[in-house]
Amino acid sequence: MGFTFETETLNGSFDSTITAGMGLRTESRGCNLINQGPTGHNAPSGCLAQSSGVADQGDLNYDRGDMFTNYLKGTHELLLKMPEDITFMARGTWIRDFAATDTTGTLSFNTPESVGSNGLSDDARDDLAFKARLLDLWVSKGFDVGGQRVRARLGNQVINWGESLFVAGGINNTNAYDYQALARPGVQLKEAVLPAPMLSVASGLGSGVNVEAYYQFRWNKSELPPVGSYWSTTNALGEGRGDYGFSEKDARDSGQWGLSLRWQPEDSDVAYGFYVMRYHDKLPSLRVAILDPNTFAAAPTWEYQEDRMMYGISANMPIGDWAVGTELSYRP
């Protein structure tokens, strides 16, 4: 639902999407996914040795017939177009989940005392119950330089490069993702891609050549399902990991930029893209520091690799009613 409005100097629109959805577990908790020794209400028998290393709290928290999500969410967008080719865009989203924190009360043998009797830490429970965030918030200006149209955009925005929109690890590495949102029924892709504050500039150069560059002012990371949630597969990642002894070191904000050149030859349906990018990882790598070599006491820390370089090429073309694209990326 939405509406548009217009004045002598302003054209605008405001659109809202309200969605309700639910997810239900249809199978019982599998013995081969549970460690021996769970406790609490209706605790199942586990088939795995306690030394298995399997994190089973997310599996224990929801039994057959339980709703692991029952939510109401909204996405709201404001678009304003002003004189002098100025555009303003704001998008925000919120979600309230009424079922994700209603768990079985079964605890794994190694669930820390700091985790509540519902198998969720305070951080994980807060993240599951309600979340509101600002996504896009940018202003853009169009102007002419040397007979070519230039567009400059400043603020929270998404950069879409390459041909892969749904698979991470390719050319499209500028953006962080909310993987918890992607697992939610009824999600739109624009709700799961997390914008970052950037300055981007794009322009045509003539002869079918277009160039775009950006500089990112602040690093942001991808978000994973909270520890103990239905889609959680490890106690080490996601909100609540601190209760299990895992810390995290963020990447620095500076040093991320990218440059792309797109070219479509005359009398050709094939469009080519060439890319170079410097970025910090959005997903972490684990570093374990040994504190005491005699007892093997360790301090596991998730770290985000910095100053990674990526070089890529892409191509796309129409074949009948189909659009076909391919890409190749290289990281030294």
What feature does the model see in each segment?
Residues 5-54, 61-62, 88, 92:
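Transmembrane beta-strand segments of Gram-negative outer membrane beta-barrel proteins
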Residues 9, 81-85, 144-148, 194, ...:
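Outer-membrane beta-barrel channels and translocator barrels
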Residues 10, 54, 58, 66-74, ...:
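Residues that define the transmembrane beta-barrel architecture of outer-membrane proteins
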Residues 12-20, 88-90, 150-154, 211-213, ...:
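Transmembrane beta-strands of outer-membrane beta-barrel proteins
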Residues 16, 74-80, 90, 136-141, ...:
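Residues on the lipid-exposed face of transmembrane beta-strands in outer-membrane beta-barrel proteins
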Residues 20-26, 94-98, 102, 156-160, ...:
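Transmembrane beta-strands of outer-membrane beta-barrel pores
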Residues 84-233:
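Outer membrane beta-barrel
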Residues 247-332:
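Long, internal scaffold/assembly segments composed of regular secondary structure
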